[in-house]
């Protein structure tokens, strides 16, 4: 009888272990299916992200091309004006000067249309964000005394700094002794 109880206990234990093993196998199968689903989802997201990145790169290139085309279309009339000026180069120096001045004025209008403005020049306060000091000249300290090369900005973005001489107080000979 004791042997029978022992066999019953063993059978129950074996049955419990079998049920537990079956439950673990079912959980493992469910986890494997979930892992497969998550892996598929990950791969789809990875592909979607790669496609998004490629679209953004293409869009950026297209916008850059549009910007260049816009600038070129705006600048081509200046080339046309220069061609016309060369045709009339036989004319008097004064008419050439007037033609070049008209071309320059037209070019400034184009720049303004593109949102580009000239950096403030002579008489304005020296600003290292927009001015490059290339020398000193007698004049009001801290002010731009002379512009050697114009500077331009588009909003807060600097296209090119103005190359300027900054004013400094003229030292008297007495100060030098």
Swiss-Prot record:
Transmembrane helix among keywords: no
Cellular component, GO annotation: cytoplasm
GO BP terms: protein folding
Location relative to the cell: Cytoplasm
Gene3D superfamilies according to UniProt: 3.90.20.20, Head domain of nucleotide exchange factor GrpE (2.30.22.10)
Keyword line: Chaperone, Cytoplasm, Stress response
Pfam name, any one: GrpE
Keyword Chaperone: yes
InterPro entries: GrpE (IPR000740), GrpE_coiled_coil (IPR013805), GrpE_head (IPR009012)
Domain of life: Bacteria
Molecular function in Gene Ontology: adenyl-nucleotide exchange factor activity; protein homodimerization activity; protein-folding chaperone binding; unfolded protein binding
SUPFAM superfamilies, per database record: Coiled-coil domain of nucleotide exchange factor GrpE, Head domain of nucleotide exchange factor GrpE
Subunit description: Homodimer.
Family of the protein in this entry: Belongs to the GrpE family.
Function: Participates actively in the response to hyperosmotic and heat shock by preventing the aggregation of stress-denatured proteins, in association with DnaK and GrpE. It is the nucleotide exchange factor for DnaK and may function as a thermosensor. Unfolded proteins bind initially to DnaJ; upon interaction with the DnaJ-bound protein, DnaK hydrolyzes its bound ATP, resulting in the formation of a stable complex. GrpE releases ADP from DnaK; ATP binding to DnaK triggers the release of the substrate protein, thus completing the reaction cycle.
Protein name (record): Protein GrpE
Lineage of the organism: Bacteria, Thermotogati, Deinococcota, Deinococci, Thermales
């Amino acid at each position: 009888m004791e042997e029978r109880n022992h066999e019953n206990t063993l059978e129950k234990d074996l049955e419990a272990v079998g049920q537990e093993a079956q439950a673990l196998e079912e959980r493992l199968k469910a986890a494997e299916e979930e892992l497969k689903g998550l892996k598929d989802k990950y791969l789809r997201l990875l592909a979607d992200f790669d496609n998004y990145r490629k679209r953004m790169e293409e869009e950026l290139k297209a916008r850059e091309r549009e910007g260049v085309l816009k600038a070129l279309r705006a600048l081509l009339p200046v080339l046309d004006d220069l061609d016309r000026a060369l045709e009339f180069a036989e004319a008097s120096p004064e008419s050439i000067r007037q033609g070049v001045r008209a071309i320059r004025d037209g070019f400034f209008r184009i720049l303004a249309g593109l949102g580009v403005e000239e950096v403030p020049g002579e008489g304005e306060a020296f600003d290292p964000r927009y001015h490059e000091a290339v020398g000193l000249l007698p004049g009001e300290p801290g002010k731009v005394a002379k512009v050697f090369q114009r500077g331009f900005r588009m909003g807060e973005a600097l296209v090119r700094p103005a190359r300027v001489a900054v004013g400094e107080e003229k030292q008297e000979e007495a100060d030098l002794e």
